[in-house]
Amino acid sequence: MVGYLPHCTFNLNNRAASIDTPLHAYIPYDHVDHLHPDAVIAIACTKDSRALTEEIFGGELGWLPWQRPGYDLGLKLETLCRERPDIEGIVLEGHGLFTWGDKSKSCYLNSLDVIQKAADWLAQKNTGVAFGGSAYDNPLSASERDAVATRLMPLIRGKISTVQRKVGHCNQSDEVLAFVNANDLRPLAALGTSCPDHFLRTKIRPLVLDFNPTADDLEAELARCVEGLDQQLEAYRTDYADYYNRCKRDNSPAIRDTNAVVYLVPGVGMITFAKDKATARIACEFYVNAINVMREANGVSEYVGLDEQEAFDIEYWLLEEAKLRRMPKPKSLDGQVAFITGGAGGIGKATARRLLNEGACVILADIDTEAMVSAKQELSADYSQDVV
């Protein structure tokens, strides 16, 4: 299949076709959407996904069991479409949603309708306590959370950047705090994410740090957490290497970075690390999606993570490996953070531009606050808010 796809391109397009190309190609409609909305994935990732799909949508949507994307799944989508020409979409177990239409607008409106119907149903049915209730009721103030994150982030970054420099991102949103403060944090985190589009960014499971936000002496508790950091990081690396060795096949690519991407800190929030700021932020956003899915799935049924072998076969799929190898080579300062004093002046901004062009993130400092704000806006517009 992979060898044939380049022969189907137009205008000598040398970009490799998506792994999902057959899934779109065999659906017999002019316009096809493939989506991963939290509300629908929450239904797709329950133990009784098929029954819930039928309960919510009746005969409007079809359903297919989990299968890795590819040619065979494309044929199954086509078969279901032809056997049931009245359906307006298909839920893929543990994966996502397909919808379609004869025109782009009708396809778009169909997608919105399906997502809204799932969200409305969940809002009506999910009236229980999320994540087994709260173990801690926001025990730390915003300034205390920031202080803990500020202490942990550079330490973790240094310890996991021995092979490749990494940049961090922190999220303390309400949905994240509800998860990291929950009674069921550790068992749910251990289940891993289900949607493959999530765990390809986040790894299959996060690292939950050993930290008690209700300790009488916060400084002493933070010192204890820091003291045990090496052991926790090494335990995750060992667990990931064991996962690789259990699941690898004869032609599997070599093991990749064994460090966690997502770090959950009780009472504090979520920290993510990746090769650059944008990738770290996106990984964080994807794990927020996973949190939303777990909350809604467990509220109406029981959340089911993807089978470990299936997850490995996606993560180390040769087609995914080929995609990684096609990515642009890192710039010379990727993963570096530069602090520039006098950053609002001509020399400071020129220095910032030079470093940004080489892949660094920059922090600007200047005694002229107004000029510094203007410089930040200018550079953010040219390079993105992620890196300035």
Where on the chain are the PLM-derived regions?
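Generic hydrophobic, amphipathic alpha-helix propensity
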Residues: 347, 372-375, 379
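Canonical Rossmann dinucleotide-binding motif of NAD(H)/NADP(H)-dependent dehydrogenases/reductases
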Residues: 331-363
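Short, well-ordered alpha-helices that flank and scaffold nucleotide-derived cofactor binding pockets
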Residues: 45, 79, 353, 357, ...
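Rossmann-fold cofactor-recognition segment
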Residues: 379-388
